[in-house]
Amino acid sequence: MFRIVNGEDYSPAVQQRNSLDFGKAPSLLWTDHGGSNDRCETGGNGRESGQDRVKRPMNAFIVWSRDQRRKVALENPQMQNSEISKRLGYDWKMLTEAEKQPFFEEAQRLRAMHRDKYPGYKYRPRRKAKRSQKLLPADSSVLCSRMHIEETLYPFTYKDGCAKATRSRMESRLSRSQPTNTASSLLPQEHRSSWTSLSHNRVT
C-alpha cells in the first residue's frame, strides 16, 4: 500500500519536482504537496469532498526544506520562491547520505502515522479539467474573412451563418458575371462579321 522509503524517492528529478511545487504557493512551506492538484482522497468512501481530501505524508526532502526555506527567505527577502526552490534543491543534492538520514527516518515516522490514521488511503492526483474552446466574436470575424478568401475552393463546407452570406455573395457574383461573359463572347463574332463584310466589299 505504501512504498518503502529508498534513494529513488529522493532522486534529483523527484527533488526538483518537489522543489518546483514549493515555489507555487506559500502554503507549501509547511506541507509537502499543498496544491490543489496534489490533494488526495481517502480510500474509505471514495468521495472527493473537502473533508475527505487528505494530503500526502511529507518525504525527507520536504521535512528538511520546510525549515530551510524559511531560513533562506528571511536571509534573502528579495529572492523569489522559484529561486529559493532551486537553491534548496541544489543544497539537498550536496548533502551526504549521513546528513540526509535523520530526515529519511522522520519521513518514515510520518508515513507510519499517516498509514495508521488513514488505512485506506490512496494517492489519486486530481486531473485538470479541460477548458472548452469557444469561438469569440473576433474569431468569428476571422472565420468569415477566411471563408471569403477560400470560398472558391470550399464554397459550401461551413455550416454557420457565414456560409449563407458566402453563398449569396457567390450567386450575386455569378449573376453579374453572366452578362459580361455573354457580351465578351459576342465580341469575336461581331469582329469576324465586320472583317467578312469588309473583305466582300473589296472583292466586289
Swiss-Prot record:
Localization: Nucleus speckle; Cytoplasm; Nucleus
Main location: nucleus
Gene name, Swiss-Prot/TrEMBL: SRY
InterPro entries: HMG_box_dom, HMG_box_dom_sf, SRY, SRY-related_HMG-box_TF-like
Keyword presence, 4Fe-4S: no
Disordered: annotated span: 32-52, 169-204
DNA-binding region: 54-122
Top-level taxonomic group: Eukaryota
Protein known as: Sex-determining region Y protein
UniProt lineage: Eukaryota, Metazoa, Chordata, Craniata, Vertebrata
